[in-house]
Structures are given as structure tokens and as C-alpha cells.
Amino acid sequence: GMKILKLLLDEICETFDVPYLHIGTDEVHFTNPQFVPEMVAYVRDKGKKVISWNPGWKYKAGEIDMMQLWSYRGKAQQGIPAIDSRFHYLNHFDTFGDIIALYNSRIYNADMGSDDLAGVIMGIWNDRLIDKEWNMVLENNFYPNMLAIAERSWRGGGTEYFDKQGTILPVDENSEVFRNFEDFESRMLWYKEHLFKGYPFAYVKQTHVKWN
């Protein structure tokens, strides 16, 4: 099995001129304790850095180049750069609610990146075959969410982590949280009109809506 996998890795590394290769390691039972370390070493010998899921294979600093955190159990480790994907699976989202939480969320509950916090990735993990590919972009609100997480990752900060009450805007329209999202919403709608015209951009203004 390892011999065949190495042949596949040869083909992948020859085909894709990229600096990183993600090798997975989540949701599987390992019977050979040398399997993952040998695969990591093999990919590194190809001149590429290796990413692995967490939870997944248990690494120490220096044994892997980067970890991608998934599920609530994903934890960053000192000495290993981490990508936060834990609450960023868009197919789990509510279209008009969770973009607020995404915009307000502190990535890995930190103010800014560091040597141990490399950034964030959003994912669309649809489990069903969809007739039209663009439906995934539309139904998962991809472009608005992309702009929300891009701004948060570029600017840092945020008010809380995604798993708290951030899907609801404050009632007080003068609060900093409300005004910040209102400002972002205005700029996002400008992008919708000017740069995403003709693309499936599933968002309309909502900060003016009052709920009783």
C-alpha cells in the first residue's frame, strides 16, 4: 500500500507545482506507526511542505509543517503553524445569520496571526451531487462569506469566537459591533454591484431590518 501511495505522490508532485501538500490523516485508524512519518518524509524529500488535519495524526513540533484544524477538537500546538477551519464550513451556515458571526469572529480567538497561527480557510463540503456547479456557490453564500472572512483575516481583531452569540446583531445601532458590520455590509454591496455583477451573490442589505 505504501509503495502504491508513493507512486501516486510522485505523480501529484510532478503535476502540481505548489509549495504545500495536504496529506489528510483524519478519521482513520492507523495500524502502522511508521506510515505517516514515512509519508511526511517522502513528501518533504520532494521539496514540498506538508499539511495535516488536527484532529488526526499526533505530531510534535518539527514533525509536520502546518496543521489544519477541523471540528471543535482541533487545537493549535506551539511550534506548528495552524490554519483555523473549525467553524468555517459554509455548507453548515445560515445564509443571512452566520455571515455576521463570521465577520465578528476572532480567528482561533486571537487578535492577530503569529508564527503558530497561520490563518483561516473556508470550506464547502457538500455531500450531495448538485446538477449545476454554480448552485454550490449560490446556496452556500460563497462570495459574501469570502469577503467577510478576508476582511477579518486581513484586519485581525473581532469581538468573540464563532461559537458564541455572534449571529445576532446588537439591538443598539450605535454600538461599535453594529456600526462595524453596517460599514462592512455597505462596502460588500458595492463589491456586489461593481465587481461581482453577473455572479451568484446571495446577499441583500439587512442591517435596516428591525425584528420585534
List each model region and its residues.
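Active-site neighborhood of glycoside hydrolase catalytic domains
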Residues: 1-66, 72-77
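Flexible, acidic glycine-rich loops studded with aromatic residues
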Residues: 60-65, 70-212
